[in-house]
């Protein structure tokens, strides 16, 4: 048994080469009654997925999280500025904070725009589902079929979030190659067209400096007196990619708008 495509029609079950859509917890329980050979742990996990999706907070978390992350960038920067002796990580982080905070602040203001209210409302009305962790670790190719696994983070949300997560991680690993990003968006739209609101939302999500925030937050909540060489290397890589990332964002504007 595999959980496959998530859509507004529910979570598609692929079992014995037969597709079934489930949108409610009781449907998952009914499936369990006809699948004695199915491991109990898998049934409980899938039941939890549907339960969590139906009872999710309907998208408010997206706006709240972005605002909170922006405040955390500022908090970490203020702490680093207050230190008399700064290590290499702190010097690099502070040298880039103005650029990244400006991006974070702009994205935070954009996400709270009224232009997205209707899109969030539609998500709530349709119980639109997202995978929540759509990346190459969770994608399995079976012949001409593509199966998605690991739905632990599935929830009600705007489906563009899955495209954003997949696109951002792919771009990070490929140096923000503009042609690759352009082709990925074009391929997505061959199957599902993006609305005007989704285009603006995708740009806003890509604008937010997610990787920089993660490093600042990890630093602030960790042992500040000890610099992790891995964190330092990640921060250097983030800074080194920023010019290409900015150029990619400019290109995306032309593609999306």
What is the predicted function of each stretch?
Residues 160-193, 206-226:
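Active-site activation/catalytic loop segments of kinase-like enzymes and analogous catalytic loops
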Residues 13-19, 26, 52-129, 231:
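ATP-dependent phospho-/nucleotidyl transfer catalytic cores
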Residues 117, 204-205:
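Short acidic/histidine-centered micro-motifs embedded in hydrophobic/aromatic stretches
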Residues 213-257:
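ATP/Mg2+ or Mg2+-diphosphate-binding catalytic cores
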Residues 1-56:
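ATP-binding pocket architecture of kinase catalytic cores
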Residues 1-5, 110-159:
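Active-site acidic catalytic loop and adjacent metal/ATP-binding pocket
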């Amino acid at each position: 048994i595999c959980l496959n495509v998530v859509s507004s029609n529910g979570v598609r079950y692929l079992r014995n080469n037969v597709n079934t859509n489930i949108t409610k917890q009781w449907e998952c329980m009914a499936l369990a009654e006809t699948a004695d050979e199915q491991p109990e742990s898998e049934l409980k996990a899938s039941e939890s997925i549907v339960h969590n999706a139906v009872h999710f907070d309907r998208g408010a978390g997206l706006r709240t999280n972005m605002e909170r992350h922006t405040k955390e960038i500022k908090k970490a920067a203020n702490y680093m500025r207050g230190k008399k002796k700064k290590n290499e990580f702190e010097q690099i982080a502070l040298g880039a904070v103005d650029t990244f905070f400006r991006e974070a602040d702009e994205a935070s203001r954009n996400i709270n725009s009224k232009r997205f209210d209707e899109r969030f409302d539609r998500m709530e009305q349709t119980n639109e589902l997202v995978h929540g962790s759509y990346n190459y670790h969770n994608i399995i190719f079976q012949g001409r079929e593509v199966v998605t696994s690991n739905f632990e983070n599935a929830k009600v949300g705007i489906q563009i979030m899955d495209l954003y997560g997949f696109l951002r991680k792919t771009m990070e690993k490929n140096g923000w190659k503009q042609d690759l990003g352009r082709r990925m968006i074009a391929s997505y739209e061959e199957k599902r067209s993006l609305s005007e609101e989704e285009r603006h939302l995708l740009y806003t999500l890509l604008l937010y400096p997610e990787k920089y925030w993660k490093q600042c937050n990890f630093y602030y909540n960790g042992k500040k007196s000890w610099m992790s060489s891995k964190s330092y290397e990640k921060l250097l890589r983030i800074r080194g990619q920023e010019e290409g990332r900015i150029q990619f964002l400019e290109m995306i504007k032309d593609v999306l708008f």
